[in-house]
Amino acid sequence: MRGLQAVGKVVSPAKKQSLANGMPLKRLNNHVPQPNQIMHPFLGLTQTELGLLCCTECEPRIRSGKQIIPAMVRDPMKDQTEYTHAKLQFPLLTNISAWVKDHAMYQYSSEKQLVSAATLPAFKAAETEIPEAIRAVCQPSAQSIEGIIAAGVVSTEDLFQFLLETYPARAKTILPILLREYQKLPPAELHLEGTLHRALLAFEGQTVDKEDIEVLNRLLDNYSTEFGRRYEQVLDATVLQQLLRFYISGSALTNSRTTLQFLLKRGVCPIPEVLDAYFLLLEKAISVKSQPDLQARRLAKMACIAGCAPILKHTITATMLRVLTGCAAHTGEILHLVELAAGMPSCKEVLQENAVQLVNAVSSFAPSPAVENCTNISLLLQRLEQIYPDGLPKQFVHAASQAYMHNGNWGAAAVIWNRYGVPEGLVEIPVVNIRCRFPGFRQEDRQHLETLLKSK
């Protein structure tokens, strides 16, 4: 699957993104993706949108028919699946009701109740049995370890757990030796989980590099091969979250994404701290520097969060909302993110920290006309006023005022000022080159706004 394979590297998927220009494939322009082909965790199609879709007779579409829907689309010419931006515009009216029904069924089947990893019982490793004589001479070196193992006094598992617990700062030295010794053991003597738990604990707070990740992956692959079962199927969920932390620390985005998916399949949502780290890694790995094209960058990011819909219903932090806002391409997506955030215990703080990002996003989706941008700002403020019934925080007031003015809507800015006062720190009204004769956009509306500014 081209596109998804581009995300399959350890450090940064965007560096190998095969969709070089990020543009939708023209030969697939008229292909409407099925609901299960859409890779979007916060598309958030409302009942109103779906109802209007069924009632529209002329070019029925969703999200203005724009090619902004990340989806896996079957290319009949190449007989393969392409990962690209698609559009929800239906050429045949007869297919719409079936698509809406499939969408409802897919949404229902995709519902998954998660439990927080914070509520899981702590992993309990078996106590190591190391004789005092061995403890006194055991050192984290290949010569010392090989000599003790050859003596047959203690088990390999007990020895490595003791070393990792006693010398956590030497984990980088111990891990390659651990891999070499485990490869010598017969399957009946392999007990990876406790040792892996100790190793991951030892790496906490340390720098994880590519070599560390490769050694650990080989260790896990050997374990899976010997037992005939994938390690993610048998490891404790707490250890899986530790593994996710390890991969994130090493900037291994693909490994992190895969491990996150394993946790979700187990019905476990990582703790907020780990989720924040994952989203920050996503932002760092797929950046303007690594992928200059905006559309290709968005595709790569959406591929890494495509399965995160259950997480967003369970947990949204300020960091997550900021990164997700940067992935949005339509006001409907922003409104759905606000709706999801509104269900969180700390929703007001989360939204308040992202005031500027949310307002700037909805005010810039339409390059022109400015009227559409201002409509989007008003839609956002209407929803926010329901969340903040006692009045909008000053961050939203200031951001909305600036956005209205940069779009030339002096009248809307005046309404905000009359309700909440002139924002602190505002010293002048920007000059914008927008010609519009609608009420609120006229020169006399600007003059009225200037009067309000002078009289503050």
Curated annotation (Swiss-Prot):
Main location: mitochondrion
Intrachain S-S bonds: none
Single Gene Ontology MF annotation: translation regulator activity
One of the Pfam families matching this protein, by short name: AEP1
Entry's localization field: Mitochondrion
InterPro entries recorded: Aep1
Keywords, comma-separated and alphabetical: Mitochondrion, Transit peptide, Translation regulation
Any one GO CC term of the record: mitochondrion
Entry keyword Transit peptide: yes
Family note: Belongs to the AEP1 family.
Entry function: Required for translation of the mitochondrial OLI1 transcript encoding subunit 9 of mitochondrial ATP synthase.
Protein name (database record): ATPase expression protein 1, mitochondrial
Organism: Eremothecium gossypii (strain ATCC 10895 / CBS 109.51 / FGSC 9923 / NRRL Y-1056)
